[in-house]
Amino acid sequence: MESYHKPDQQKLQALKDTANRLRISSIQATTAAGSGHPTSCCSAAEIMAVLFFHTMRYKSQDPRNPHNDRFVLSKGHAAPILYAVWAEAGFLAEAELLNLRKISSDLDGHPVPKQAFTDVATGSLGQGLGAACGMAYTGKYFDKASYRVYCLLGDGELSEGSVWEAMAFASIYKLDNLVAILDINRLGQSDPAPLQHQMDIYQKRCEAFGWHAIIVDGHSVEELCKAFGQAKHQPTAIIAKTFKGRGITGVEDKESWHGKPLPKNMAEQIIQEIYSQIQSKKKILATPPQEDAPSVDIANIRMPSLPSYKVGDKIATRKAYGQALAKLGHASDRIIALDGDTKNSTFSEIFKKEHPDRFIECYIAEQNMVSIAVGCATRNRTVPFCSTFAAFFTRAFDQIRMAAISESNINLCGSHCGVSIGEDGPSQMALEDLAMFRSVPTSTVFYPSDGVATEKAVELAANTKGICFIRTSRPENAIIYNNNEDFQVGQAKVVLKSKDDQVTVIGAGVTLHEALAAAELLKKEKINIRVLDPFTIKPLDRKLILDSARATKGRILTVEDHYYEGGIGEAVSSAVVGEPGITVTHLAVNRVPRSGKPAELLKMFGIDRDAIAQAVRGLITKA
C-alpha cells in the first residue's frame, strides 16, 4: 500500500460532509420504512465515508468488477448506510433509499446478493470476517492481485467465537491485504457490549491473535485516513471508538434505541441539525482500481478422463472423494480444497499432495471454514470443496444457511456418516446431516454408493449452482458401476431388477450394499426385490421411484444409516405422498448409538442385510 499522505483540509471537510449525508440518508430511509437501525448506521458514518471515498479503489458503476477492492458489512443491520454509500457513489438513485425494506425493492433489511454491491449476505452476526478472509486469501494467493478487502464489524458480534476463528486464520496466512474495522459504539441490542469502551483490551486481543491493531477516534476522518494508510505485513484491525446514534441529539450513546427508527417529527428536526453542518454538496468521486486480477473461467469443468475402477474392487467412498478431487484439480487451477484438520480421514490430503498451492488447511474451525469457502467463491473466482466429518458440519449450520442466502456456490463433503463408522462412537457419527442439508434452499445432496458414483458426484458438484453436499462413508465397499456409467443430478439408478420383483428397496452408501446382500439371501427363498440407488437425495428421482413401486405391488422399503427424521425415508415418503396404492416402510437408526464394530452396529440398529430381508418378508406376508 502507498505510504500515508495526509489529505488537505478541503478533502477532510468533504469527507465530513459525506459522513453527514450518509447519516441523513440512513435516518430518512429507516423513518420511511418504519423499521431499521439508524443508530447503528450513524456510529459508522465517518468510517464508511473514509473507506469508500478516500481509501477504497473501485468502479462505482461496476460494483462486482474483479479488480475492485472488496467490502463486507459484517454488522449487516447497518445496511441503510451501505445503501446510502452506493447512492452517494451514484450507483443507486437517492429516491430508491426511501424504498428500504419494501417488498418491491431490492434494498432488504440486511445486505443480500441480489444487490450488485453485496458479495455475501450478512445479518447473522459473526460471519462477515470469515468471508472477508476467503476473499483476501483468494486475492493474495490465487489471483495474486492488488485488490484489498475491508470488513466492518460491530462490537456486539465480537462475542461470537467465529470472529476469533477468522482472526486466527488471517494471522496464520498473513493476510496483509485484509483490514477489519471494529465499530466500538459501546452498546449492543439490549445491553452495553461486554467491554463497552475499553479500547486497550480490544487492541490487546487483536494483537494476541497476530493482528496490527490501531485505536482511533472513529468520528475523526483525519485519524481514520491515517489508520487506513498504515501498511503492515500482517492483517490490520482499526479499532474505532464511536458512539451509537452519533449526531442524533438525545439519542447518541443512549440505551434502548437499537433497531428503532426515529419518529417523523424527530427525524425532520435531527436532519435539519445535521444538514446545517454540511459545508458543500459536492460529492467525492470513487478512485478506480488497479486492473491486475486475472480473467477466470470456472464454467463446465470436466474430469480429464473416465474413472479407472474395476467392478468388484473395494474402496471407501471417502477415499474415492479424495482421488476424484485431486483428479478434477488437474482440469482447472480454480478448483480449491479446504479441510478442518481431517485431511487424512477425508482423503483431501491426496489433493494437497498433488496441488499444494490450492489446499487451505482451516484447522478445527468448521464454522470459519465454510465462511472462508463462501468468500473464496465470490465473484466466481474459485470452485471450493470443503471436507470434514459430516457430523462436524452441523456445527456450521448457520454458516451453511447464510451461504444459501448469499447465493454461494460451494461444495461440502462430509465423511464418516452413520453408525457404520464403528468404534469411534456417536460423537463422530453423522446421523442428522441429511436432514440438515435437505432443509437448505439451493442445496443438492449427493449420496454416492461406490467409487465411480463418487467421482461423478465430485464432477457434477463442481458444475452445480448452490450448496452441494457429498455424503461419504468409512467402510470399503465394492465397485458396482462401470466406468462409463452416466450420472446426473436427480437421476436414480436401478441396481438390481427382475420381472418378478415384489418390493422396491431404496438404500444409499453402506445400506445399498446391504440391500444387495439381502437380495442374495432372499433369492434363495425365491423372493426377488428391486434395488434402487437414489444417487441424489435432493432432488429425488420421483418418477423412477414411482415406476419401480408400481412394478412391485406398491411396496417401498427405505433403509438408511441416518436417523428416521429428515433422511431418505422421509424424502421418499414426501415424493410419493398421495399416490394411491403405495406404502413406504422405513428402516433407520432409532436412538443414540454406541461404539462397536460396523457390522455389529448395523445389526443392532436394524439396517443390515438380515433386517432388510426380514422387513421384505414381513411386507410380502402382509399382502
UniProtKB/Swiss-Prot annotation:
- Listed GO biological process terms: glyceraldehyde-3-phosphate biosynthetic process; pentose-phosphate shunt; pentose-phosphate shunt, non-oxidative branch; regulation of growth; xylulose 5-phosphate biosynthetic process
**Annotated positions of the Phosphoserine modification:** 3, 104, 295, 345
Reactions it catalyzes = D-sedoheptulose 7-phosphate + D-glyceraldehyde 3-phosphate = aldehydo-D-ribose 5-phosphate + D-xylulose 5-phosphate
Co-factor binding details = Binds 1 Mg(2+) ion per subunit. Can also utilize other divalent metal cations, such as Ca(2+), Mn(2+) and Co(2+). Binds 1 thiamine pyrophosphate per subunit.
* Entry GO CC: cytosol; endoplasmic reticulum membrane; extracellular exosome; nuclear body; nucleoplasm; peroxisome; vesicle
Q: Where is this cross-link: Glycyl lysine isopeptide (Lys-Gly) (interchain with G-Cter in SUMO2)?
A: 352
Enzyme class (EC, first level): transferase
Gene Ontology MF annotations: calcium ion binding; magnesium ion binding; protein homodimerization activity; thiamine pyrophosphate binding; transketolase activity
Keywords tagged on the record: Acetylation, Calcium, Disease variant, Dwarfism, Isopeptide bond, Magnesium, Metal-binding, Phosphoprotein, Thiamine pyrophosphate, Transferase, Ubl conjugation
Residues modified as Phosphotyrosine are 275
Residues involved in thiamine diphosphate binding: 40, 77, 123-125, 156, 185, 244, 258, 392, 428
* Site entry (Important for catalytic activity), positions: 37, 258
Q: Which residues carry this modification: Phosphothreonine?
A: 287
Query: Where are the N6-acetyllysine modifications?
Result: 6, 11, 144, 204, 232, 241, 260, 538, 603
Residue positions of the PTM N-acetylmethionine?
1
Q: Which family does it belong to?
A: Belongs to the transketolase family.
| Subunit structure comment from the entry | Homodimer.
Which PANTHER family does the entry mention?
A: TRANSKETOLASE (PTHR43195:SF3)
Associated condition reads: Short stature, developmental delay, and congenital heart defects: An autosomal recessive syndrome characterized by short stature, developmental delay, intellectual disability and congenital heart defects including ventricular septal defect, atrial septal defect and patent foramen ovale. Cataract and uveitis are observed in some patients.
Query: Briefly, what is this protein's role?
Result: Catalyzes the transfer of a two-carbon ketol group from a ketose donor to an aldose acceptor, via a covalent intermediate with the cofactor thiamine pyrophosphate.
The protein's name: Transketolase
Which species expresses this protein natively?
A: Homo sapiens
